[in-house]
């Protein structure tokens, strides 16, 4: 029997949420700390499935680290260079794209004999554009099942040179190449083909590389030049920011049924592009206050928007369910990459929004949402996708309860999400 959680109608939300660490930052920081010279202490590390997959992989690759009891503080002894595996290894990475893509590139350095695999859904998530680019730089990569998809067999061989990568499907392919390139023996120039999606995620990568002592020449996000033969240097300590994508649910809840909700651990100077989600809520009519270490949102009369969401694809999902509480028809554009995430998020979102009574048009790379006069009670399928579960929890901010199937799928990024939501929720 599938587990489910029924949320009763929430009359008001009010309070403060201390955000768990960012998934995007946590997994990048772990990998760079492992490759760096010196010992790095990471604090506010996210404790979630995706991060555990990265930690397990690093452990199997011979990286020594110690974790605090709550798994949010990690001390890592850096290897001072690429991984070199002496025996054949198979690493299981679940459905963690933030582990699969960067590790695939990192294991193309040095001498390796490693298979990367994961859950059935991971084997449906494309990686061909990354593999093509790695091969251009000399890497020895073999597909073990379906061409262009994991599992992959990696044997090193990447030396640098001129490579081209398609930027239109996932920014993680470029992130993976950028993080590996400084450790290649030769210089690397990466040219971007097509429109680069999710640019702010590249900024996270460049920020972290700089933190670990490596500069990248960024030519207007069209070409990146990286000197080879470098070494990452531990910064000693690094504080992982709160997860801005996770913040979106609480800020949206406040916009719909505040009170005021304040999220801490991110602020106006955050490196994560998903903080721009707050600007979208403001455009819809909510009231936003920015601090150095917080963002707060107070309820406002919400109106529909029509916006390009390419810069905040993960947080944009939250707007799709927030639209149920806005006046008019909301249109989210340029979100094709929803289709290659944990599930085909465009199809899933359209299906589940219709269940609660919304009128939805699902396009190739856009979605329109028109709210019903009254939301309908429904069992919401979550497709083993943490964000589907969290987005649809917002339905309870109406007069209608909602049942979330497989609520534990939030463990991918936010294991105690529903407990945190309950903390700020007040019933009538």
Swiss-Prot record:
SUPFAM superfamilies registered for this protein in UniProt: EPT/RTPC-like
Molecular function in Gene Ontology: 3-phosphoshikimate 1-carboxyvinyltransferase activity
Superkingdom field: Bacteria
Main location group: cytoplasm
Record-annotated active site: 314 (proton acceptor)
Entry's EC annotation: 2.5.1.19
Binding site for 3-phosphoshikimate: 23-24, 28, 170-172, 198, 314, 337, 341
Binding site for phosphoenolpyruvate: 23, 97, 125, 172, 345, 387, 412
Alphabetized UniProt keyword annotations: Amino-acid biosynthesis, Aromatic amino acid biosynthesis, Cytoplasm, Transferase
Keyword Ribonucleoprotein: no
UniProt GO BP: amino acid biosynthetic process; aromatic amino acid family biosynthetic process; chorismate biosynthetic process
Pathway annotation from the record: Metabolic intermediate biosynthesis; chorismate biosynthesis; chorismate from D-erythrose 4-phosphate and phosphoenolpyruvate: step 6/7
One matching Pfam family: EPSP_synthase
Subcellular location: Cytoplasm
Any single GO CC term annotated in Swiss-Prot or TrEMBL for this entry: cytoplasm
Reaction(s) catalysed (UniProt annotation): 3-phosphoshikimate + phosphoenolpyruvate = 5-O-(1-carboxyvinyl)-3-phosphoshikimate + phosphate
Primary role: Catalyzes the transfer of the enolpyruvyl moiety of phosphoenolpyruvate (PEP) to the 5-hydroxyl of shikimate-3-phosphate (S3P) to produce enolpyruvyl shikimate-3-phosphate and inorganic phosphate.
Family per similarity comment: Belongs to the EPSP synthase family.
Quaternary data: Monomer.
Protein name: 3-phosphoshikimate 1-carboxyvinyltransferase
Lineage of source species: Bacteria, Pseudomonadati, Pseudomonadota, Gammaproteobacteria, Enterobacterales
